[in-house]
Amino acid sequence: MPVIASRISPQSEAFKANAAHLLAQVEKFRSFERAVIAHSSQQAERFAKRGQLLPRERVARLLDHGAPFLELSTLAGFGMHDDDGASRVMGGGSIVGIGVVSGKRVLVLASDSAIKGGAISPMGLKKSLRAQEIAKENKLPLIYLVESGGANLLYQSEMFVEGGRF
């Protein structure tokens, strides 16, 4: 395959400015991802008192030790519904990703019961449906860890599953 010639100069000021801007945006994105984890982790003491693991701990115990986990749709519903995009970043109320269980690549979907009791928001539902599509398209087994209060009743009217999608 021939190499595609480029006229981009990594030493140019424009390139350096664009790279710096991009890295700043990536860090901003990563800070929102960390906020999702922090929001969920605030419930650690409550879960420990009940003898429960936090949802991310359950996912970690499910996966093969040391195997990679590619989390997907980390900011689903960002700035929507009860997610304010600042102090309450919820990631769609679930953890979705591709990992390895017993040596097999799988898609894991875990409701995050540390966020609103695992209640499903409209974007959380879309995140779950998209995870199911990804599993089907890639012939991945789907492991679903559920601990949920059901639909978030404030947004129940927005959560009708589109025809042929469930």
Question: Positions of the model-derived regions?
Answer:
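Terminal-region recognition feature
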Residues: 1-166
